[in-house]
Amino acid sequence: MPLLTQYNEEEYEQYCLVASLDNVRNLSTVLKAIHFREHATCFATKNGIKVTVENAKCVQANAFIQADVFQEFVIQEESVTFRINLTILLDCLSIFGSSPTPGTLTALRMCYQGYGHPLMLFLEEGGVVTVCKITTQEPEETLDFDFCSTNVMNKIILQSEGLREAFSELDMTGDVLQITVSPDKPYFRLSTFGNAGNSHLDYPKDSDLVEAFHCDKTQVNRYKLSLLKPSTKALALSCKVSIRTDNRGFLSLQYMIRNEDGQICFVEYYCCPDEEVPES
């Protein structure tokens, strides 16, 4: 990739973060999966980049792009954090078009000089290089959902087609999705309460769609559909999903997404339970 040969060592030293990709879609596709708010907070460490989007202090989405997904990943500090307009970033990443020409890849080099500086994007396709400068902002403190593995009560790993089926079959005109996890039947049940009445979808723990089932005790929790609907973007791209609930009823949906080069990235959604559960 020409972009990889355009900078010498001295030019590198001015940047605290440099990351390059031969195929920009390996980044843009994952970021689109969490694009339900305009702004995002970016955290970079030697392990890679985490991009976080939040809404109403009730839901948080994190996209993880591991360092080895990049052809080049150089970070000069222990961690680098900045806030950015995600809508503008995605527009820039697709500046050569969102529908790729067969056999043509858009290469990317991202450079960040540090606090107060813009995020520099160098995009190259077919010998044409475009430079974008995106203003960065003071990072806001993100929510700590304190989703500790020791407090996880139930965990199910599902092939994503099973959850896609649920979202297409259940009546989504209601306000909430109810998730029931039990050591006994129905094991794993999704319920909605819409205009056409109540609907349920059950997954036996020995179903071909269920890859793992761990349940310590029965839990029934409700989550606002308006908070969960943005996660369907990640669901559509994913091959597997890990569904976990902790002792407070908080929900974690972790989607495993395989990019065009066969590498794995993760998108995780945290959602707090709906406290307005009606009396049965």
UniProtKB/Swiss-Prot annotation:
> Which PANTHER family does the annotation name?
CELL CYCLE CHECKPOINT PROTEIN RAD1
Compartments annotated for it: namely:
Nucleus
Q: What is its main location?
A: nucleus
Q: Its gene?
A: Rad1
Q: What does this protein do?
A: Component of the 9-1-1 cell-cycle checkpoint response complex that plays a major role in DNA repair. The 9-1-1 complex is recruited to DNA lesion upon damage by the RAD17-replication factor C (RFC) clamp loader complex. Acts then as a sliding clamp platform on DNA for several proteins involved in long-patch base excision repair (LP-BER).
- Protein name as catalogued: Cell cycle checkpoint protein RAD1
Origin organism lineage: Eukaryota, Metazoa, Chordata, Craniata, Vertebrata
**UniProt subunit comment:** Component of the toroidal 9-1-1 (RAD9-RAD1-HUS1) complex, composed of RAD9A, RAD1 and HUS1. The 9-1-1 complex associates with LIG1, POLB, FEN1, RAD17, HDAC1, RPA1 and RPA2. The 9-1-1 complex associates with the RAD17-RFC complex. RAD1 interacts with POLB, FEN1, HUS1, HUS1B, RAD9A and RAD9B. Interacts with DNAJC7. Interacts with RHNO1; interaction is direct.
Known tissue expression: Expressed in testis, uterus, bladder, spleen, ovaries, lung, brain and muscle (at protein level). Expressed in brain, testis, kidney, heart, liver and lung.
